[in-house]
Amino acid sequence: MKTQRQQLILKLIASTPIATQDQLARELRRRGLRVTQATVSRDIKELGLIKVPAGENLYRYAAPPGQRLINPYGRLQRLFADSVTKIDDSENLILIRTLPGTAHAVASCLDSLDWPEVIGTVAGDDTILVIVKPKEAVATVLQRFRELGEG
């Protein structure tokens, strides 16, 4: 739901000049989504939306160049707290179990952090495989995951 809502937000701001959180919330409600101002505010922050000039003394929301997350660590903390159910490891692999449908979002956020020890992730519906190199770095990565979970 969250991913779909955020994708809709990106489509809306690309096609409609939206200047305020209230206006964005109204547009989402018009499309059948139940949202609060707090939800819209979090989505704006997680998506890293910026305000750009839209005429004289007017501004509108826009996606940042390249649409990279501005605060991927903060988003990952929230995703870990909300989604991760179990973490296990073997050799240079870490397996993260999540609630159904959330693994891709968690893996995408992990990838955006560009940790040098993580050479890649593979996500299914509720499972993420994290590949660590060298295998001696697994303990370091697991500690980071624990810290994320403690938020």
Swiss-Prot record:
Main location (coarse class): cytoplasm
UniProt record, GO biological process = L-arginine biosynthetic process; protein complex oligomerization; regulation of arginine biosynthetic process
> Where's it found, cell-wise?
Cytoplasm
Pathway where this protein functions: Amino-acid biosynthesis; L-arginine biosynthesis [regulation]
Please give the SUPFAM superfamilies that the UniProt record associates with this protein: C-terminal domain of arginine repressor, Winged helix' DNA-binding domain
InterPro entries named among the record's database cross-references: Arg_repress, Arg_repress_C, Arg_repress_C_sf, Arg_repress_DNA-bd, WH-like_DNA-bd_sf, WH_DNA-bd_sf
Question: What's the family?
Answer: Belongs to the ArgR family.
Q: What is this protein called?
A: Arginine repressor
According to its UniProt entry, this protein's organism is Moorella thermoacetica (strain ATCC 39073 / JCM 9320)
